[in-house]
């Protein structure tokens, strides 16, 4: 399993300036279970980065709607979603290998067979590997908010990224985001609302209630106990 996890930095007009990390590498130590999963399940479920577009029908061995999740953490909710929807295909991207190992272990334990994972920079994967008009859903749950003003430019949700996602979605496909940082939710709403081709699925033209399809994470449950809010945004590709 290879790692090269660099994301572009954007200027105030959304143009790439140089390549820096849009996240902090917190690899930590692998547990024995995670190491075992990477050694034994990665050859079956893992996808190495390639400069060539992936053929989803070949990868999954069938034609089915594809959901891409960016930054799946330890993979608990991703595995739960894949298990609950065996008729769909799921591809997860996470840059931290302990999370990838945990996800592989969980998927194996749950008998999930409609899930593949990658350990690489999602922006580069989108550019190089994901065919245009190929995804039914893109999920981005609780990305790093980079709450300090000087770090806001590191936020993954910027106009160029949202436009890139738009190009990978099928017509009618949905970009689903969630954050527990209100300022980031407002930023996401501003970015997404500025792009022609997206339609906000919120009846009030801002946020949507958490759909049942998105499991509540332990992180989110802890936030609820502390009185923290969570904002879900869902935008459909309409052109």
From Swiss-Prot:
Gene designation per UniProt: trmB
Stated role: Catalyzes the formation of N(7)-methylguanine at position 46 (m7G46) in tRNA.
EC code: 2.1.1.33
Database matches in PANTHER family: 3-DEOXY-D-MANNO-OCTULOSONIC-ACID TRANSFERASE/TRNA GUANINE-N 7 - -METHYLTRANSFERASE, PENTACOTRIPEPTIDE-REPEAT REGION OF PRORP DOMAIN-CONTAINING PROTEIN
Transferase listed as a keyword: yes
Interaction with RNA: region residues: 150-155
Gene Ontology CC annotations of this record: tRNA methyltransferase complex
Annotated binding of substrate, by residue: 148, 180, 217-220
EC class name: transferase
Catalytic center residues: 144
GO molecular function: tRNA (guanine(46)-N7)-methyltransferase activity
Designated name of the protein: tRNA (guanine-N(7)-)-methyltransferase
Reactions catalysed: guanosine(46) in tRNA + S-adenosyl-L-methionine = N(7)-methylguanosine(46) in tRNA + S-adenosyl-L-homocysteine
Lineage, top ranks: Bacteria, Pseudomonadati, Pseudomonadota, Gammaproteobacteria, Enterobacterales
């Amino acid at each position: 399993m290879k790692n090269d996890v660099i994301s572009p930095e954007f200027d105030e007009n959304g143009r790439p300036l140089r390549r820096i990390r849009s996240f902090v590498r917190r690899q930590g130590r692998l547990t024995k279970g995670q190491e075992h999963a990477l050694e034994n399940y990665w050859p079956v479920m893992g996808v190495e980065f390639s400069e060539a577009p992936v053929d989803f029908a070949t990868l999954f061995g069938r034609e089915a709607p594809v959901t891409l999740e960016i930054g799946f953490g330890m993979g608990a909710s991703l595995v739960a979603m894949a298990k609950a929807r065996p008729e769909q295909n799921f591809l997860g991207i996470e840059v931290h290998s302990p999370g990838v190992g945990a996800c592989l272990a969980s998927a194996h334990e749950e008998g999930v067979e409609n899930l593949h994972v990658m350990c690489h920079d999602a922006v580069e994967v989108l550019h190089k590997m994901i065919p245009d008009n190929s995804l039914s859903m893109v999920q981005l749950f609780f990305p790093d908010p980079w709450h300090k003003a000087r770090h806001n430019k590191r936020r993954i949700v910027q106009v160029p990224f949202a436009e890139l996602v738009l190009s990978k979605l099928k017509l009618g496909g949905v970009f689903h985001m969630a954050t527990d940082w209100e300022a980031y939710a407002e930023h996401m709403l501003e970015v997404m609302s500025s792009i022609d081709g997206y339609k906000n699925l919120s009846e009030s033209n801002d946020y949507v209630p958490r759909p049942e399809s998105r499991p509540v994470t332990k992180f989110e449950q802890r936030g609820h106990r502390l009185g923290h809010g969570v904002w879900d945004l869902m935008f459909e590709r309409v052109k």
